Curated annotation (Swiss-Prot):
Its cofactor is Mg(2+). This is ATP-dependent 6-phosphofructokinase, muscle type. The gene is PFKM. It comes from the Eukaryota. Homo- and heterotetramers. Phosphofructokinase (PFK) enzyme functions as a tetramer composed of different combinations of 3 types of subunits, called PFKM (M), PFKL (L) and PFKP (P). The composition of the PFK tetramer differs according to the tissue type it is present in. The kinetic and regulatory properties of the tetrameric enzyme are dependent on the subunit composition, hence can vary across tissues. Interacts (via C-terminus) with HK1 (via N-terminal spermatogenic cell-specific region). It comes from Bos taurus (Bovine). The active site is at D165.
Length: 779
């Protein structure tokens, strides 16, 4: 292991890396550029910026400049790409590529990191395959010497996919997609208020010429009435169907209709469906007041979301490792994301599958196009179809009664989870009840039936509309059992944080005494702290992360103006350091103190010395995050006092406790979508479990697998019995014993210029896309 530790620090000595951004810009590209530069320098390599994409590579000169550590400071929170991007005709010609090769060889650069879409990455692969021919041409014409040719005998290429459309196969999320969704959802939320005031129908056109991802996720995240995407053209009688759907929604009491259209939407015959066509149809047939909004380039703009900054940073680190470990025999690869795992995939395999999708759509093999888009896309489509197109049955014969509740502290996205649970339950023909104020409400009988429109418009609302309490059930088993019988509750969906999980464990224990508690239940993790065992992510954490990030950006801006100032910021999370660590990565913090990574006074001293050194450079500001319970003695005040004293005359310190604003705000697209899918998945499981446990006219479920936590684990959504998770829990500190994100902490330290050892054994290995497709669970 130690051999691997030290290998990373010397991996790049004598090597040079060039980084360029090409094609359409995407938010988060700067985070990737910053990570490539800093990790490159950390490994001992020289790193060069190529300005203006491939055009800069062809033109050379001042377009290729060496980067320094400080030259990527304050880049993280900027949208677009700071080093510029351009569509380049010259590079498509061999002559242009010859000039590009000449520019690289002269600078001794043999590693190229390309951040762009599939066109940019295909170009890079062509460049690599021609490399030796280009060198021999340059040598023949006397532009380079034999020695230079030998030194640069092969070119390593790694691609990072930067595209807001998420149209690249083999990666769950491309850099920029999440931020584009943020822009779209901000606009949808704004339009919703005006549409409701006037009872209007809005047709929103979003980007995506060949890929409907943005349109699909937007419609899931805002509960749209209809979505048009290129991969799944509507049936021939769609006009009838659409108008019927819109009038049904109105008749149920809704004051607005939202229709989302991807710019590349087509019908079954390949004829484009435009926003204007839809508007005219609705006006002509239904006479509704209908408006069209084309979002356009707004979607590419603005600040990158926390997700994109972390994604860009992680991918940048992985790209440097892939380049420096590359040999003439390793294929050009793409670094991508699967679940929350970084993976390396052969570049041309991904490009090929991406082209196959386009071909399948051109040849109208739409089912195949949908399959090739991958499991995440398919899932979104299935859930959308269920929620938007299936009508609840009229009769409730043979139906079961399922109750939904919130437990713990409020988290953004809880309402979205309640909405999808209730609606999927109704679609399956069940009677759905909602419980107010958690287990306390269950004991007091604060329970009512929820119909379809009860949860209308809940997706985008923050907090908990049902009301939530931290009270655990044990003390009130008597009353809870009585109410389970009284309301004939046959299944329980518990949406909440650590208390929801411990409450689940108590219900399991209580089954021995109370038969009434022998009903299936499922816990959907929803807490800003992300500390529920059995899940890598919980609903609400992404929203909190973005809130912290936005605040840190503003604070950094203030510090940059004041100069020589260090801010100490306290985040929430109980004992769980997820928010502090991830926000540290996303906001470019100098340090993040957390409970899981114990620190001593010596560590605090090292950090102060580090900041003293930093103040000597051009970057005269510091940002330090501290999780609220990271250490009972080294409090925020203690750290602030220590920094103030030690920094006297060099920097001054300020502290900020962010507090409960981290629980509020409207949910981010990630949390809305994640909560909606979790609710649907939980309800499908519940229906199956109730049928399994139904004997002699009543429900009796006492097996361990009838009480589960539904969690996201690496690449799949899985149900795990609460009793099995007991072993994996540190109950005193309310955290799981093992947490995946701890391995991202070294990245935070390296990007903040600490000389630490990076364990490269955890890095991604090359996988193959075809094998990847078949062996995966459906999230």
């Amino acid at each position: 292991m130690t051999h691997e530790h030290h290998a990373a620090k010397t991996l790049g000595i004598g090597k040079a890396i060039a980084v360029l951004t090409s094609g359409g810009d995407a938010q988060g590209m700067n985070a990737a550029v910053r990570a490539v530069v800093r990790v490159g320098i950390y490994t001992g390599a020289r790193v060069f910026f190529v300005h203006e994409g491939y055009q800069g590579l062809v033109d050379g000169g001042d377009n290729i400049r060496e980067a320094t550590w400080e030259s990527v400071s304050m880049m993280l929170q900027l949208g677009g790409t700071v080093i510029g991007s351009a569509r380049c005709k010259d590079f498509r010609e061999r002559e242009g590529r010859l000039r590009a090769a000449h520019n690289l060889v002269k600078r001794g650069i043999t590693n190229l990191c390309v951040i762009g879409g599939d066109g940019s990455l295909t170009g890079a692969d062509t460049f690599r395959s021609e490399w030796s021919d280009l060198l021999s041409d340059l040598q023949k014409s006397g532009k380079i010497t034999a020695e230079e040719a030998t030194k640069s005998s092969y070119l390593n290429i790694v691609g990072l996919v930067g595209s807001i459309d998420n149209d690249f196969c083999g990666t769950d999320m491309t850099i920029g997609t999440d931020s584009a969704l943020h822009r779209i959802i901000e606009i949808v939320d704004a339009i919703t208020t005006t549409a409701q005031s006037h009872q209007r129908t809005f047709v929103l056109e979003v980007m995506g010429r060949h890929c409907g991802y943005l349109a699909l996720v937007t419609s899931l995240s805002c509960g749209a009435d209809w979505v048009f995407i290129p991969e799944c053209p509507p049936d021939d009688d769609w006009e009838e169907h659409l108008c019927r759907r819109l009038s049904e929604t109105r008749n149920r009491g809704s004051r607005l209709n939202i229709i989302i259209v991807a710019e590349g939407a087509i019908d079954k015959n390949g004829k484009p469906i435009t926003s204007e066509d839809i508007k005219n149809l609705v006006v002509k047939r239904l006479g509704y007041d209908t408006r069209v909004t084309v979002l356009g380039h707004v979607q590419r703009g603005g600040t990158p979301s926390a997700f994109d900054r972390i994604l860009g940073s992680r991918m940048g680190v992985e790209a440097v490792m892939a380049l420096l470990e590359g040999t003439p025999d390793t294929p050009a690869c793409v670094v991508s994301l699967s679940g929350n795992q970084a993976v390396r995939l052969p570049l041309m395999e991904c490009v090929q599958v991406t082209k196959d999708v386009t071909r399948a759509m051109d040849e109208r093999r739409f089912d195949e196009a949908l399959k090739l888009r991958g499991r995440s896309f398919m899932n979104n489509w299935e859930v959308y179809k269920l929620l938007a197109h299936v009508r609840p049955p009229k009769s409730k014969s043979g139906s079961h009664t399922v109750a939904v509740m919130n437990v713990g502290a409020p988290a953004a996205g809880m309402n979205a989870a309640v909405r999808s649970t209730v609606r999927i339950g109704l679609i399956q023909g069940n009677r759905m009840l909602v419980v107010h104020d958690g287990f306390e409400g269950l004991a007091k009988g604060q329970i009512e039936e929820a119909g379809w429109s009860y949860v209308g418009g809940w997706t985008g609302q923050g907090g908990s509309k049902l009301g939530t309490k931290r009270t655990l059930p044990k003390k009130s088993f008597e009353q809870i059992s009585a109410n389970i019988t009284k309301f004939n509750i046959q299944g329980l969906v518990i949406i909440g944080g650590f208390e929801a999980y411990t409450g689940g464990l108590e219900l399991m224990e209580g089954r021995k005494q109370y038969d009434e508690l022998c009903i299936p239940f499922v816990v959907i993790p929803a807490t800003v702290s992300n500390n529920v065992p059995g899940s890598d992510f919980s609903v609400g954490a992404d929203t909190a992360l973005n809130t912290i990030c936005m605040t840190c950006d503003r604070i950094k801006q203030s510090a940059a103006g004041t100069k020589r100032r260090v801010f100490i910021i306290e985040t929430m999370g109980g004992y769980c350091g997820y928010l502090a660590t991830m926000a540290g990565l996303a906001a470019g913090a100098d340090a993040a103190y957390i409970f899981e990574d114990p620190f001593t006074i010596r560590d605090l001293q090292v950090n102060v010395e580090h900041l003293v050194q930093k103040m000597k450079t051009t970057v005269k500001r510091g940002l330090v995050l501290r999780n609220e319970k990271c250490n009972e003695n080294y409090t925020t005040d203690f750290i602030f006092n220590l920094y103030s004293e030690e920094g006297k005359g060099i920097f001054d310190s300020r502290k900020n406790v962010l507090g409960h604003m981290q629980q509020g705000g409207s949910p981010t697209p990630f949390d809305r979508n994640f909560a909606t899918k979790m609710g649907a998945k939980a309800m499908n499981w519940m229906s199956g479990k109730i049928k399994e446990s139904y004997r002699n006219g009543r429900i009796f479920a006492n097996s361990p697998d009838s009480g589960c936590v539904l969690g996201m684990r690496k690449r799949a959504l899985v149900f795990q019995p609460v009793t099995e998770l007991k072993e994996q829990t540190d109950f005193e500190h309310r955290i799981p014993k093992e947490q995946w994100w701890l391995k991202l902490r070294p990245i935070l330290k390296i990007l903040a210029k600490y000389e630490i050892d990076l364990d490269t054994s955890e890095h991604a290995h090359l996988e193959h896309i075809s094998r990847k497709r078949s062996g995966e669970a459906n999230v």
